[in-house]
A protein has these predicted regions:
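Short alpha-helices
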Residues: 1-23
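Generic structural signal for well-ordered, non-membrane alpha-helical segments
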Residues: 2-6, 10, 37-40, 59-63, ...
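Short gly/pro-enriched beta-turn/loop segments at secondary-structure junctions
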Residues: 10, 39-42, 49-52, 65, ...
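Internal, active-site/partner-interface "lid" segment
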Residues: 19-49
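Bateman (tandem CBS) regulatory domains
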Residues: 40-54, 106-118
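A glycine-centered beta-loop-beta connector
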Residues: 47, 70-73, 78-95, 133, ...
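The conserved cystathionine-beta-synthase
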Residues: 56-74, 100, 119-147, 158-166
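Helical hairpin unit composed of two closely spaced alpha helices linked by a short loop
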Residues: 74-117, 122
C-alpha cells in the first residue's frame, strides 16, 4: 500500500543520510541516552565508580589493614598494587577462606590471587563487561577498571543492571 511504500522510502532516506554523515552507534548513544539502544551502548567509563571508591592496598600491607579497606569500601574485594600503581592482584572472600589459618600474620601480597584475571578498560561497552562477568570461568560480580595497567575505577554488576544494560 502507499503507506507502506512511504515508510520504506522514509527509512531508506534516513539510512542514506546517516551513512553520508558518518553517524556511528556512539553518536546514537549521545543523542538518545535514555532509550534501550542508548543504554546498550553505554561504556564501562559511564557507569564505573571512580578512584576515590577504589579498594586498593600495596603488596606489603598487613592483612589486618587490607581487611579494614575491604570492609570500609564495601565491594567484597581489595585490589593489590605495586609501587608504580599497577594492579598486580586481588583479594576476595575466597582468598580469605583459603588463608584463614594465620590470616592476620600475612601481607596482602601473600594472600592475593595474582592477576586479577578479569579487568576491563573504561572504553569497553557495559554490555560486554556484563558478558565477561557472567562467564563461568569464574563468574564475578565486581570488575576493576584499568587503564594502562593502573586501576581507574570499579564496576559492580548492579551498576550495569540499574542502567538498563541487558
Amino acid at each position: 500500500t502507499s503507506t507502506t511504500l512511504q515508510l520504506a522510502i522514509g527509512d531508506a532516506l534516513a539510512v542514506a543520510l546517516l551513512e553520508r554523515r558518518g553517524f556511528k552507534p556512539q553518536d546514537f548513544r549521545v543523542l538518545h541516552p535514555g532509550g534501550k539502544l542508548g543504554a546498550m551502548l553505554r561504556t564501562v567509563g559511564d557507569l564505573m565508580h571512580g578512584a576515590d571508591e577504589l579498594p586498593l592496598v600495596g603488596a606489603a600491607t598487613p592483612m589486618k589493614d587490607a581487611l579494614l579497606v575491604m570492609t570500609e569500601k564495601r565491594w567484597g574485594i581489595v585490589g593489590v598494587t605495586d609501587q608504580a600503581g599497577r594492579l598486580t592482584g586481588a583479594i576476595t572472600d575466597g582468598d580469605l577462606r583459603r588463608h584463614i589459618e594465620g590470616l592476620l600474620t600475612h601481607t596482602a601480597g601473600e594472600v592475593m590471587t595474582p592477576g586479577p584475571k578479569k579487568t576491563v578498560p573504561p572504553t569497553m561497552l557495559a554490555s560486554e563487561a556484563l558478558a565477561l562477568m557472567s562467564d563461568p570461568a569464574p563468574a564475578v560480580t565486581v570488575l576493576f577498571v584499568v587503564d594502562a595497567g593502573r586501576p581507574v575505577g570499579i564496576l559492580h554488576v548492579h551498576d550495569i543492571l540499574r542502567a538498563g544494560v541487558m
